[in-house]
Design a protein with these regions (language model features):
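Extended, low-hydrophobicity, polar/charged segments
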Residues: 1-158
Length: 158
């Protein structure tokens, strides 16, 4: 299983400015994270579309429109990945999932609202454990996502 140290090593290898922030209380939901930091929270949610994983990256306060995802990726069935699937596919637990540094390449969809945030704006996202968040500039995160080799769909409004 992967954790905050694996995420930290992944980012250090890419020579990126970031911080893995540790909390006393868990930050497993975007609401619990928002209660502990000032700033923009994004979340990474793994879906299964016709048995293939799709990672959706969106603002913490927003919800996924499953029908939009289904149409975008041209599949019949879309569902949330089960906890076991999240761990098997990404290497991380639900509630700790970062948008990067996964066990395998995962097709990704980014919320269009995320692309509208200033490049140097600080965002917080899953930090690899239930007690850590990744603090990073939005532009740096999107650059890493672009270099990941993951298939990406155009940004959509969730």
């Amino acid at each position: 299983m992967l954790n905050e140290k694996d995420l930290e090593n992944f980012l250090k290898e890419r020579n990126v400015n970031f911080e893995i922030v540790k909390f006393e209380k868990n930050v497993v939901t975007s609401t619990s994270a928002a209660n502990q930091v000032e700033g923009i929270i994004i979340k990474s949610i793994l879906l299964i579309c016709d048995e293939f994983p799709i990672l959706c990256i969106l603002l913490g306060k927003d919800r996924i429109d499953f029908e939009k995802v289904r149409r975008e990726v041209n599949c019949k069935d879309v569902r949330l990945a089960k906890a076991k699937e999240v761990k098997e596919i990404t290497g991380y637990d639900i509630g700790a999932l970062p948008p990067i540094a996964h066990k395998q390449k995962i097709t990704t969809i980014i919320d269009k609202k995320l692309t509208e945030i200033k490049e140097d704006e600080i965002i917080y996202c899953g930090g690899g454990s239930h007690y850590h968040l990744l603090r990073i500039e939005k532009g740096k995160l999107l650059k890493i996502l672009g270099e990941s080799g993951n298939k990406r769909y155009k940004p959509i409004n969730f």
